Amino acid sequence: RDFRLLLDSLSSATAHPDTARRLILFFATACLVTGDRTVSAVLRLLSLIEPLNPSTYHRLFSHRRWCANRFAKLIANFVIDRFSSSDDIRMVGDETVDGHRGKKVYAKARHRDAVRSSHSHTVYRYGHKWVVLAVLVELPGVGRPLALPLLVALYRDQQTNLAEGRRHKTQAQLMCGLLARLMRWFPERKFVFAADNAYGTHQMCRFAKRHQRQLVLVSKFIADANLYKRPPRRKPGTNGRPRVKGEALLKPCEVVERRRRGKGLNVRWYGGGWRNVEVFTATGHWFKSGKGLVEVRWVMVRDRDGTHRDEYLFSTHISMSPTEIIEMYGGRWNIETTFQELREHL
């Protein structure tokens, strides 16, 4: 019944009732198709339901007028209203590469294939890179959170953007745009967003701080990050330019080396299991020349079993506990599972 309500609401995103009806039929039939998920495969099954002209459906995505942004907003409202009852909505983000080797494929480029690459060997793949923003939801009978994609953006390389006169945007900048759109749709909700080091940039930290009423960023940190205290208050009558940073603090790796022993915790880890870890944590203002300071809480995680590498994480909300930061970052593996399941499904 809820799925029918969603399909009916999608009709408001089209310019003509017939377009809405065909889209609803197409999407509903696509859920039932087995084998290749192509337009032709959907139409073969749909032809058993009602007589149709195949060219009419092929033109749905190229000639008919419908708003993808409106579709995304309707789906986001449907998912968040039903599955995210808590005050803080957990979001995860990542990118995935969809292979397309054709000569006339728009925005095709060579991208690193995260699935087949390792730390010592890089595999490249030609196709599209999609930046994906997903929400984590808990469903009855499922042993882990599900990452449901809400918004996607196509990453275009510098050559494509230059040819089209478009300003080049990095993956992090595209993700900032997706998060900004989501915050406009839900001005009264707060989002906790976790992603890997591609999105743990100083720029994204500043973005999260500007929207700190609605957004918290959790990501990987730099072991030798430059941390400082807040600059002292300027005394009246002082000459010269105001200070932009205070006294230098120890780098995270230096703090770990000096303390030697951290606090023991049992936390939820990748894959939904539990793991005994040793953590070190502190706060400081992350500095980048010309960009200013951003206050963060960093956490160093050391696996006591010795099976995982040491990880440095951070949060733009300094009141978050080390356990919350670790478990929030560990939840991002669910979007990788979503990518894997989508590839198998398609």
Predicted regions and their residues:
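Generic alpha-helix structural propensity
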Residues: 22, 34-38, 52-56, 66, ...
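Single, function-defining residue in the core of a domain
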Residues: 1-13, 25-26, 46, 87, ...
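Gly/Ser/Thr-rich loops at beta-strand to alpha-helix junctions
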Residues: 33, 97-99, 196-201
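Active-site-proximal, Lys/Arg-enriched surface segment
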Residues: 62-156, 283
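Gly/serine-rich nucleotide phosphate-binding loop at the start of the catalytic core
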Residues: 1-62, 66
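Short N-terminal helix-initiation segments at or just after the protein's N-terminus
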Residues: 29-40, 74, 129-139, 254-257, ...
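Short gly/ser-rich anion-binding loops that grip negatively charged ligand groups
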Residues: 32, 47, 65, 86, ...
